[in-house]
Amino acid sequence: MMKKIVLDIQSDIHAHTMERMLMQKLDDCQVVISELPDATAEWCKTHRPDVLLMEVKAYSPWMFKERMAIRDKVKQDTENCRVILFVDDDTDGELTEKVRQAKREGLIDAFLFGSVSENYFASVIDSV
């Protein structure tokens, strides 16, 4: 069964790199890149993804609180969508801890650090 993935990543270049990597590493997936955080919930409503991967930053519109609001909207329309947060673990310890706590509380299904290998990255997405 084809896995649908929506990416909401700050940098277009980074998003397209992730898209290519996922298409190479996963056998059967469709990747959609959300062009703006404000459009992510609508993209998810339209495409009904299995996985939503959102990058979290210390500034708007990629802040943790804003990402959780998008998560809430997506879960209303696509209850079975798995939410994964992507964070740069080298730059913001407090933000990284918020993401970890969200996983502990069951608000997200997984998190990924920017420092993980491509194989691990793809494996986590494939496993949820």
Where are the predicted features?
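Conserved phosphotransfer cores of two-component systems
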Residues: 45-47, 73-80
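Conserved N-terminal glycine/acidic-rich loop preference
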Residues: 1-2, 10-19, 48-57, 94-108
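Hydrophobic/aromatic residues located in beta-strands of well-ordered beta-sheets
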Residues: 31, 83-84
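Conserved phosphotransfer microenvironments
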Residues: 52-77, 87-98
